[in-house]
A protein has these predicted regions:
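Glycine- and acidic-residue-biased ligand/ion/polar-headgroup-sensing regions
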Residues: 57-70, 74-77
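Conserved short histidine dyad/triad with adjacent acidic residue
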Residues: 40-58
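A short, N-terminal "cap"/entry segment at the start of jelly-roll beta-barrel domains
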Residues: 1-38, 51-52, 88, 128-146
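Short beta-strand His + acidic residue motifs that chelate non-heme Fe in jelly-roll/DSBH
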Residues: 51-53, 71-72, 98, 104-111
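Short acidic-glycine-tyrosine-enriched beta hairpin
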Residues: 77-100
Length: 146
């Protein structure tokens, strides 16, 4: 059996300033990645609404760290079937999935930013991954590169 080169392990603290603006308009603080996925911290300002997007090749799992808000998700191509489009409340301790082909948009309640950590699988490939879609709310933040 051939030996594989091990990937060095890493430790990283959350940066004080964002590294980028996501295509949905959230402030992104990059954390770590491996071949199978990457982790980042996202923050949407209090009272703000993101841009609605879908992803071409990645799936995500989110964990809400702080703040409250709502998320809209719709499985593309299934708009008329019950249960495949919904709006749900978000708060600290909640986790959710964004499967491949899911359109989504979220908003933060007034009073505190909505802050979450997301695992992206496979790692975020870069520009061209996010595709703008029509969502239920009017965005209030500037979008980053798609």
């Amino acid at each position: 059996m051939p030996k594989t080169v091990p990937i060095p392990f890493e430790t990283k603290a959350l940066s004080a300033t964002p590294d980028a603006t996501a295509p949905d308009g959230t402030a992104v603080r990059l954390l770590l990645s491996l071949r199978g996925g990457s982790v980042a911290h996202f923050e949407l300002p209090a009272g703000a609404v993101s841009h609605a997007v879908t992803h071409r090749t990645v799936e995500e799992i989110w964990f809400i760290v702080s703040g409250r808000g709502s998320i809209w998700r719709r499985q593309e191509g299934w708009e008329r079937q019950e249960g495949l489009e919904r709006i749900e409340s978000l708060g600290p301790g909640a986790s959710l999935t964004i499967p491949l082909g899911t359109a989504f948009q979220f908003r933060a309640e007034a009073g505190a930013p909505l802050s979450f950590v997301a695992v992206t699988m496979p790692p975020w490939p870069g520009e061209g991954e996010a595709v703008p879609v029509h969502g239920p709310w009017r965005p209030t933040v500037a979008a980053g590169p798609t």
